């Protein structure tokens, strides 16, 4: 937490914790999402260990799959408890923005149970971006011990990146073949080929942010294509979902000093999972196969937001 002492962000020590409200017990708290003293997870509760957190996540998903959810609603006293006592989430989940993948629901969780971060493709592409900074906040300040990167079947971002990679690969092959044929031809044309024509007015447009997002995921599709040689577009995209989960985990281990150090010390665990939209089940993948290699790397680690804050302090 000292990493953030000069950032202006609230620390657990600065959060006001008042005595438990006497009428909270009169509400029906359901079975909750891990142990809680006020019916909801707040700073009154102790952080759960990584192993405890993963067990709670697994149990919640089993209830979701079976249609036996226990989270229930929030009464007025529970809402006041969350507003007054701060947050102590069980785990941090990096999920996809897909509207069909409601992270809290598929783990049978309520407000205050999970610290959820979502974007298209459940990915981290910038060492100093808001996603990395938010994960650091969750482990350094909120004291979550489990970070779960959650991909899902049928991911549109991954499919888009896969199609983009395959289209570019095909176009590159065509261009290389055409260039080779032109060079070997004895009948050289004086006219410029289509590849040498200057761009026409209006044909070049500024690259969209969406295309930039897909570009960042193209290496994932490329790796999946190599590992699944000869696979169909759908098969490659399905495999790329897992590849992308590992890539996000490896990115966090490589570019966040806070996360890297907490994982190395055993205080925090970083694991992957994939949500099956058809069955509702979450496949827990465990730790990255490259975790030990990345933690043993002695080279320069690009400072993350928290790392910079620590260097300045």
Predicted feature residues:
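Poly-acidic low-complexity segments
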Residues: 73-75, 98, 102
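Acidic active-site catalytic centers that drive phospho-/nucleotidyl reactions
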Residues: 90, 152, 276
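Short glycine-enriched loops at secondary-structure junctions
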Residues: 95-100, 120-123, 152-155
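Conserved functional hotspot residues or short segments at active or partner-binding sites
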Residues: 149
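Divalent-metal-activated hydrolytic enzyme cores
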Residues: 2-86, 111, 121-145, 156-313
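Catalytic core of membrane glycerolipid acyltransferases/transacylases, capturing the structured
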Residues: 100-117
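Glycine/small-residue-rich phosphate/adenosyl-binding loop
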Residues: 88-91, 96
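A broad, low-specificity signal marking well-ordered, structured residues that form hydrophobic/aromatic
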Residues: 91, 114-115, 268
């Amino acid at each position: 937490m000292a990493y953030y002492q000069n950032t202006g962000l609230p620390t657990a020590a600065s959060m006001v914790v008042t005595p438990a409200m006497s009428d909270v017990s009169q509400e029906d708290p359901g079975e909750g999402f891990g142990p809680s003293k006020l019916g909801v997870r707040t700073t009154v509760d102790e952080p759960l260990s990584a192993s405890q957190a993963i067990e709670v996540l697994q149990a919640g998903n089993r209830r979701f799959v079976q249609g036996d959810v226990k989270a229930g609603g929030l009464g007025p006293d529970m809402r006041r408890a969350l507003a007054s006592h701060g947050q102590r989430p069980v785990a941090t989940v990096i999920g996809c923005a897909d509207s069909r993948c409601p992270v809290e629901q598929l783990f049978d969780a309520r407000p205050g149970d999970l610290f959820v971060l979502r974007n298209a493709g459940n990915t981290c592409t910038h060492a100093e971006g808001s996603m990395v900074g938010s994960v650091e906040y969750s482990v350094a300040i909120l004291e979550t011990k489990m970070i779960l990167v959650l991909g899902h079947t049928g991911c549109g971002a991954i499919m888009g990146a896969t199609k983009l990679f395959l289209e570019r690969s095909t176009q590159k092959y065509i261009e290389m073949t055409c260039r080779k044929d032109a060079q070997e031809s004895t009948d050289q044309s004086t006219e410029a080929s289509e590849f040498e024509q200057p761009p026409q007015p209006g044909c070049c447009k500024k690259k969209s942010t969406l295309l930039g997002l897909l570009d960042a995921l193209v290496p994932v599709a490329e790796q999946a294509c190599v590992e699944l040689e000869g696979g169909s577009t759908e098969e490659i995209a399905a495999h790329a979902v897992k590849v992308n989960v590992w890539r996000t985990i490896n990115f966090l281990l490589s570019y966040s000093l806070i996360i890297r150090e907490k994982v190395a010390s055993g205080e925090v665990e970083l694991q992957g999972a994939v949500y099956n939209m058809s069955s509702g089940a979450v496949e827990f993948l465990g730790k990255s196969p490259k975790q030990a290699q990345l933690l043993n790397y002695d080279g320069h680690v690009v400072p993350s937001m928290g790392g910079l804050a620590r260097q300045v302090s």
